[in-house]
Amino acid sequence: MTAVAIALTTSMSARADHSFKHAALYKNPSCGCCEEYANYLRRAGYEVNVIPTHDLDKIKREHKVPEALDGCHTTLVGGYVVEGHVPLNTLNRLLTEKPKITGISLPGMPLGSPGMGGQKSGPFKIYEISNRSQQVYATE
């Protein structure tokens, strides 16, 4: 009986630790790199619900993404907005540290970023989405 209780408690704790791994990814219906980014997250253990929309700008503004930080797609995960092709290390850092910001963004569609083809030409600057003006959250 004790072994069953321990196993059940351990299973429930493990599930709670990974509850932030549920993501909703909003994208333009015709965009293929967004699907590649969703697959990148899935390979890392995230459950990703891809939501095609023709109102992507509306989604971005509703979640307080400034136009200067617009990325290819908008992902909602763990109570944060993740804009664009943000690398997994930075995404996981956000979800672990839980800073008091709205989210993070890798603006544009930089070559070599997760889900994009091509060669990375230099470090990526990932910015905070917050009330502060364009603070760098991470460089990868």
Regions found by a protein language model. Give the residues of each.
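Compact recognition or signaling/catalytic modules
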Residues: 6-8
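Thiol/selenol-based redox catalytic cores and closely related redox-interacting motifs
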Residues: 62, 68-140
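Local sequence-structure signature of Cys/Sec-based thiol-disulfide redox active-site neighborhoods
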Residues: 17-44
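N-terminal signal peptide c-region/cleavage motif recognized by signal peptidases
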Residues: 11-13
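N-terminal export leaders
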Residues: 1-2
